[in-house]
Amino acid sequence: MSDESPATLRRIAEEGARLAGRVLAERFQGERTIEYKGGIDLVTDADRAAEAAVLGFIRQHYPGHAILAEESGASKGSGLRWIVDPLDGTTNYAHRVPHFCVSVGVEGPDGVLAGAIYAPMMDELFSAARGEGATLNGRPMRVSGTTELGHSLLCTGFPYDVHERPEGPVGLLKRFIVRAQGMRRTGSAALDLAYVAAGRFDGFFEFGLKPWDVAAGSLLVQEAGGTMVRIDGAPFQVGIGDVLACAPGLASQLISESRGFLADIGWVPPAPRA
């Protein structure tokens, strides 16, 4: 396939995400093999099966494109790069908590061009193409109009090294939990970003994310009219692991609070990941 327009890339991302989502849904109640990649970082046989399904589909349409996937790593190619998380929310999935998703994004030299996030247990497909807006199951979606931090519902997550380095994620959680209306921790960063884009959450922040966690979701937020930045307010790029996404009416308040906290702990921006 030679068509690399954002609209076509979006359609391929959507179809690939749905394909992987069906694999996950079919295996959800069955037996599964669970392995530990780190202290609290899991991988299941369903992750690998879903990844094989979506990568095979992408390669059918764009055999020359590069791919970065959570389980199989990077494969070189020319032109665009697909960034795939076949199962975001693996711990939820392993415990049969039905809150997880597939995330498929594709980026060019100037950033993400298209992306899709599919939550199979709810049959919700969030997608976006650059310059064409964001949708939920085909209907346009927008970030919330919330402008007061005290009226906001925020969400966050914890990186896999939170046991060794809790000061950032736990400290910022403490700072916001007493200022927001409510706080949630769902276990899927990609879905958290999709929920910000859909106006369900007013803001999201997290440390230590990988490109496959944020590629598709960042475009959803931006195309839905939201703010997507590094956690200190600097410009966002896919390789940045410490991020903040929110409704535009909350951006200055959240960034100000975040900067104050980061200064207190002596935070140093990590180098962007490839």
Regions flagged by a language model, labelled:
Residues 1-11, 15, 171-178, 191-274:
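Oxyanion/phosphate-interacting regions
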Residues 23, 64-66, 140, 182, ...:
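Residue-level detector of anion-binding/catalytic polar loops
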Residues 37, 70, 186-188, 231:
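Conserved beta-strand termini and adjacent loop/short-helix elements that scaffold enzyme active sites
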